[in-house]
């Protein structure tokens, strides 16, 4: 999933979409064109430096793959794992000392895939 996410990022797609697209491809889910359009509004911490939108893409993927209850549990697990490494969930704080978010996107893809595989 990481390689696909980074591939789409290199092609210019935003953080939320690259995680969602890579995950739906890996797990055989048809993603409607409208999903890309909806993700256009979900980038750069919702435009105000808020929550990392790659995390949002992962949460959307959990919602497609699992029940509501399970998706919420996986969401919290992902947030804890991510926060342990980056000490924040905020786009502004995470990106402040980086030129780009390639490492962050890669890590989110890995964590997301690990959580999905453990809970299939």
Language model regions located:
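C-terminal binding/interaction regions
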Residues: 74-120
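A short glycine/serine-rich beta->alpha loop
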Residues: 3-10, 41-50, 94-98
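Active-site-proximal helix-loop elements at catalytic-domain edges
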Residues: 1-27
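Phosphate-handling active-site elements
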Residues: 27-37, 63-77
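Glycine/serine-rich anion-binding loops at beta->alpha junctions
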Residues: 44-62
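Acidic-glycine-rich active-site phosphate/pyrophosphate-binding loop
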Residues: 20-39, 83-88
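Short cysteine clusters
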Residues: 15, 52, 91
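Buried hydrophobic packing segments
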Residues: 19-23, 57-64, 108, 112
């Amino acid at each position: 999933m990481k390689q696909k996410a980074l591939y789409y990022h290199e092609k210019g797609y935003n953080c939320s979409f690259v995680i969602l697209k890579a995950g739906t491809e890996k797990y055989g889910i048809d993603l409607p064109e409208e999903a890309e359009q909806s993700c256009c509004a979900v980038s750069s911490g919702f435009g105000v430096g808020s929550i990392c939108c790659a995390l949002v893409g992962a949460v959307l993927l959990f919602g497609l793959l699992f029940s509501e209850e399970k998706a919420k549990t996986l969401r919290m697990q992902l947030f804890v794992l991510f926060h342990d490494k980056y000490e924040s969930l905020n786009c502004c704080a995470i990106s402040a000392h980086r030129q780009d978010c390639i490492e962050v996107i890669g890590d989110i893809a890995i964590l997301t895939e690990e959580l999905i595989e453990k809970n299939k």
